[in-house]
Amino acid sequence: MNDWSIDAARAGYNVTHWSQGFYGISDQGEVTVSPDPKNPDHKIGLNELAKDMVKAGVALPVLVRFPQILHHRVNSLCQAFDQAIQKYEYQADYLLVYPIKVNQQKTVVEEILASQASKEVPQLGLEAGSKPELMAVLAMAQKASSVIVCNGYKDNEYIRLALIGEKLGHKVYIVLEKLSELKMVLAESKRLGVKPRLGLRARLAFQGKGKWQASGGEKSKFGLSAAQILTVVDQLKENDMLDSLQLLHFHLGSQIANIRDIRQGVSEAARFYCELRELGASINCFDVGGGLAVDYDGTRSQSNNSMNYGLSEYANNIVNVLTDICNEYEQPMPRIISESGRHLTAHHAVLITDVIGTEAYQVEDIQPPAEESPQLLHNMWQSWTELSGRADQRALIEIYHDSQSDLQEAQSLFALGQLSLAERAWAEQANLRVCHEVQGLLSTKNRYHRPIIDELNEKLADKFFVNFSLFQSLPDAWGIDQVFPVLPLSGLDKAPERRAVMLDITCDSDGIVDQYVDGQGIETTLPVPAWSAESPYLMGFFMVGAYQEILGDMHNLFGDTNSAVVSIEENGMTNIESVLAGDTVADVLRYVNLDAVDFMRTYEELVNQHIVEEERAQILEELQVGLKGYTYLEDFS
């Protein structure tokens, strides 16, 4: 590509749109991060950052966190709602509640809470969906507004802990997910002498579209029907505790791509709110739950990996709908709460790792088949000669399909013993020559060619063996076909010469990234610069800050990666604030109840039995180092 430029690279990887300005490509072809939007000229080259960490003894793969991105995401969302409240003259405020299930890492939660440390009245609270999460937020919520929202299924202990939170000075909303929870709350609150703050999760009829749409609608796992909500109101009236009902909650599902779905869901929920107010409930908080999407592919569309709205439009629609419906019912406007964890955390983390090797198809010259060869091979040779000397553009697709059909027949004949191994190898190489030639002759401007182009890009793609576990670091890519931006961290000033797929180092054929951001769409292969072992480049997996760490599993006993917290100082200097070591081999063995100490005893017995005395110390040291070592590959040069 003679017309390749840095702008072409930026457009090709669509960095401008999915990165929200946090990541970019420099004029030198290096991927950069600008974690502090107040100082956009303060950039860090990710390639150099990774090399510096490796020199300091931090082995790849490493998950790099940028806390300044978390700060910006918190404050930009709060600002969007503040502006919408002012625009529509809304008579209440906004509170951002972070659901820690999205990323429970101490650094992440603390940085989110610290993002508004300078505010006189912080607009932050925390959400818990289990007893362990509740124990965590009880110890951390005082750093913000002390508002805690308790979701999820509950037992008596969960409820007691939530009520104890009130005694500790927190404002704890216990959201009823099912009818039986009310009886437990009433009993435990009486026993502890604590008046509860109650919330209801309404089960809306409306269901948003997306991968998590089952979270909403009449068949959703959580929430109360209209009849059950009325039962709660009646029981609270009987116990003279209707004033304890202070919050209405609903959830349309994570990653709602279409703003119309959000508007419609809020509209239905707002009528629940107003009807409950008319029944005498003292509800003053309207919790819209999650759903605020992240544009993983940068297409700004209604796809499952994107969103067709921005922050201002999101806030404006919620505030506008609530304003209109509250005015219609002549009811007071409630405090708006959202639980937007994915939006806050996705961009702040990037996984950086190395390519340990590549495998490319080798297209070789072929000679005509021997005269006595099966007719099938002569047919394949004829297809190749017609293609290499052809003048008829319309024959391209026909020749390609004939070659594919002939290859399948050759493989079948080999399985029946009617074709030799050498003849099968010739057939495969002839097909590869045809595919390679056709790939260079097809045009993306011809819509009949596009499916074949996609097919050939996938068939002829290089394999990049990358030092990571898909199941540990990008589990959603495997489990729900989530798209994450992937790109080389350097060399992007040169035109991509190859297309590649990224394979992890697990012993599992599912350990492959099979979707890539490519321009304004998704492809099954990634355009990459030429790669060589003498001058390798690193790979970056972006927007992995939401859910991936806590959902990651230890397939093949690959554990947590090393991680680092990095920021930019006011003077533009890079500050590696902290480094957390990933799991060692001994750590992951312990997770599955295997004891490294016992193993060492066994190793010693085996060494004494089978190794000559002068080698025993060295062998035992190697085994001990192996147990203490990183679970990922370190020595493959």
Curated annotation (Swiss-Prot):
Location of N6-(pyridoxal phosphate)lysine modifications: K101
Reactions catalysed, as given in the entry: L-arginine + H(+) = agmatine + CO2
Cross-referenced SUPFAM superfamilies: PLP-binding barrel
Keyword Methyltransferase: no
Name of the protein: Biosynthetic arginine decarboxylase
Stored CDD domains: PLPDE_III_ADC
Disulfide bonds: none
GO biological process: one example: putrescine biosynthetic process from arginine
InterPro entries, alphabetized: Ala_racemase/Decarboxylase_C, Arg_decarb_HB, Arg_decarbox_C, Arg_decrbxlase, De-COase2_N, Orn/DAP/Arg_de-COase, PLP-binding_barrel
A molecular-function term among this protein's GO annotations: arginine decarboxylase activity
Residues the record lists as binding substrate: F286, D287, V288, G289, G290, G291, L292, A293, V294, D295, Y296
Function field: Catalyzes the biosynthesis of agmatine from arginine.
Record pathway: Amine and polyamine biosynthesis; agmatine biosynthesis; agmatine from L-arginine: step 1/1
Enzyme class: lyase
Gene3D superfamilies associated with the record: 1.10.287.3440, 1.20.58.930, Alanine racemase, Lyase, Ornithine Decarboxylase, Chain A, domain 1
Cofactor(s) the record lists: Mg(2+); pyridoxal 5'-phosphate
The EC number(s) this enzyme carries: 4.1.1.19
Keywords recorded for this protein, A-Z: Decarboxylase, Lyase, Magnesium, Metal-binding, Polyamine biosynthesis, Pyridoxal phosphate, Spermidine biosynthesis
Family to which this protein belongs: Belongs to the Orn/Lys/Arg decarboxylase class-II family. SpeA subfamily.
